[in-house]
UniProtKB/Swiss-Prot annotation:
This is Small ribosomal subunit protein uS12. CDD domains: Ribosomal_S12 (cd03368). GO terms for cellular component: small ribosomal subunit. It comes from the Bacteria. Residues 33-55 are annotated as: Disordered. Signal peptide: none annotated. The keyword rRNA-binding applies. Keywords: Methylation, Ribonucleoprotein, Ribosomal protein, RNA-binding, rRNA-binding, tRNA-binding. Part of the 30S ribosomal subunit. Contacts proteins S8 and S17. May interact with IF1 in the 30S initiation complex.
Length: 140
């Protein structure tokens, strides 16, 4: 336990907060050609690579991912949620934060139904998370 005098001399050290999605906290000023500290909920980017990867130990699957170069110049790995996708190299996508627990290094999700990414076809429940439109009512 510190004395009052020790606290006056040194003070308490501030806890540093480390972001879980650091690429969303950086902007880019193309006029000055420098990085800026502008946080945003989503960012646009271009796919440089689309592929599959296998998850960590107890799980087994082929998870779809895309390597995305963001508008701020940072390149990140993003997960493609849902069944089936239409992404390929040079597709323009929107990414949001949110890691995939069983894929190391994947800290971002691609937003389905935004920009070049199509929504999941034939999805009836949880449609808003996958960019699926409401199905037309059946005619009698």
């Amino acid at each position: 336990m510190p004395t009052i005098n020790q606290l006056v001399r040194k003070g308490r050290q501030k806890k540093v907060f480390k972001s879980k999605s650091p690429a969303l906290n950086k902007g880019y000023n193309s006029f000055k050609k420098e990085q800026t500290n502008v946080s945003s909920p989503q960012k646009r980017g271009v796919c440089t690579r689309v592929g599959t990867m296998t998850p960590k130990k107890p799980n087994s699957a082929l998870r779809k991912y895309a390597r995305v170069r963001l508008t701020n110049g940072i390149e990140v790995t993003a997960y493609i949620p849902g069944i089936g996708h239409n992404l390929q190299e040079h597709s323009v996508v929107l990414i949001r934060g949110g890691r995939v627990k069983d894929l190391p290094g994947v800290r971002y999700h691609i937003v389905r139904g935004a920009l070049d990414t199509a929504g999941v076809a034939n999805r009836m429940q949880g449609r808003s998370k996958y960019g699926a439109k409401k199905p037309k009512a059946a005619k009698k």
